[in-house]
Amino acid sequence: MIDFEHVSKTYETHNDENVALEDINIHIDEGEFVFILGHSGAGKSTFLKLIQMEEKPTEGRVLVNGQDLTKLKRRKVPYLRRQMGVVFQDFRLIPTMTVYENVAFAMRVTNISTKKIKARVPFALSLVGLEDKMDRLPDELSGGEQQRVAVARALAHGPKIIIADEPTGNIDPEMSMDIMQLFEAINKVNITVVVVTHEHELVHKLAAKYNNLSLIHI
């Protein structure tokens, strides 16, 4: 599903080089629930950018669903990204749009038909327990509820992979566990879930609770 083969990424600066990743090898199987754990500056953001082809590795290969991203043509990048749903730490909801409109908008910009949008948005919101709040604006929701909208938005187009970038960074510990339980439920329907975080304590709590988690340090 996701493979990093001897991947290094170096950023050139004016007078120096910044090594973000060095000789990283990672294998994530289809249907896995994986935590990528690392401190600030460990290269977690670079890992995400490489998967989404926002960056290319300096050395090595990145493969997603068998596609070698180092050889993927630029015109095929949108198709790659449609296989993924991304959940951000800061939610990135549009404040003037309702819950329904936020999820629908993300589908509309990828040219999904109106018919599919009308079917998929309520379904995605029901999966995260927000079907009764479709007409609310983001500022009428709690932080945990806003993150659930972000998860629904990531799910709505039917991705094979969910990638969550520090998804508990802006919510309290109790809500963090709720969000993780939601990811576990998503994973049970054979969606690969990759959570990138620096929160060691949360990860170890979850590892004690669920026996299907995989942990990768970078």
Residue ranges and their predicted role:
Residues L137-L141, E145-Q147:
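Conserved ABC ATPase signature
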Residues A156-K160:
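A short, proline-enriched helix->beta-strand linker immediately N-terminal to the Walker B motif
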Residues I216-I218:
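Conserved small/polar residues in nucleotide/adenosyl-binding loops
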Residues M97-F105:
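Short coil-to-helix segment of the ABC ATPase nucleotide-binding domain corresponding to the Q-loop/switch region
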